[in-house]
Amino acid sequence: MVEELPSVFLVGPMGAGKTTIGRLLAKQLGRSFVDSDWYIESQTGADIAWIFAKEGEAGFRERETRAIDELTQQPQIVLATGGGAVMAAENREYLKQRGIVIYLNAPVDVQMARTAKDKSRPLLQQPNPRKILQGLYSARDPLYREVAHIIMPTGHTYPRHMVNQLLQQLNSFCISTSVDSEPEKD
């Protein structure tokens, strides 16, 4: 199954566990793991907060779209996208058409707990981060669902257990997809 599995792309809000789950999943699948934010940082030589400060969110999103385009063309990788990657229609198309998209769905309380002390998230450097997270979740959840082939709730189980569940779902997804694409026999 693993050899036939296309690239796997993780989407979801900040704090959903995309990087943690992505690393573990890549290890289990014997694949390379790439985090799109880290990729952007390595390409620019600057961290995301600096890019936001100098170029604004629009400048960052342009860089993100170029990165998503490049990364989704790589064969058999596990990619963790930034939380806002789904905001651009181009990115949603790249993700949906070039691999299997897994939406790691984390409730706002889980996001708050995981991001509370993280100063590297520019969108949360506001007086009321909970309100920001709630607004982002409301705006982005339908877009995550639009691109997702698999939806996995996060925050209530250990990462290794979640990866085992994902492997089962990926196996089921691949089996059902191959059955659906086989020509009918007379």
Curated annotation (Swiss-Prot):
Binding site for ATP: 15-20, 121
Broad EC category: transferase
Cofactor note: Binds 1 Mg(2+) ion per subunit.
EC number from the UniProt entry: 2.7.1.71
GO cellular component: cytosol
PROSITE patterns with a match to the protein in the record: SHIKIMATE_KINASE (PS01128)
Catalysed reaction, written as an equation: shikimate + ATP = 3-phosphoshikimate + ADP + H(+)
InterPro entries recorded: P-loop_NTPase (IPR027417), Shikimate/glucono_kinase (IPR031322), Shikimate_kinase/TSH1 (IPR000623), Shikimate_kinase_CS (IPR023000)
Residues the record lists as binding Mg(2+): 19
Pathway assigned to this chain's UniProt record: Metabolic intermediate biosynthesis; chorismate biosynthesis; chorismate from D-erythrose 4-phosphate and phosphoenolpyruvate: step 5/7
Cofactor dependence: Mg(2+)
UniProt record similarity statement: Belongs to the shikimate kinase family.
Name of the protein this chain belongs to: Shikimate kinase
Organism: Psychrobacter cryohalolentis (strain ATCC BAA-1226 / DSM 17306 / VKM B-2378 / K5)
Gene: aroK
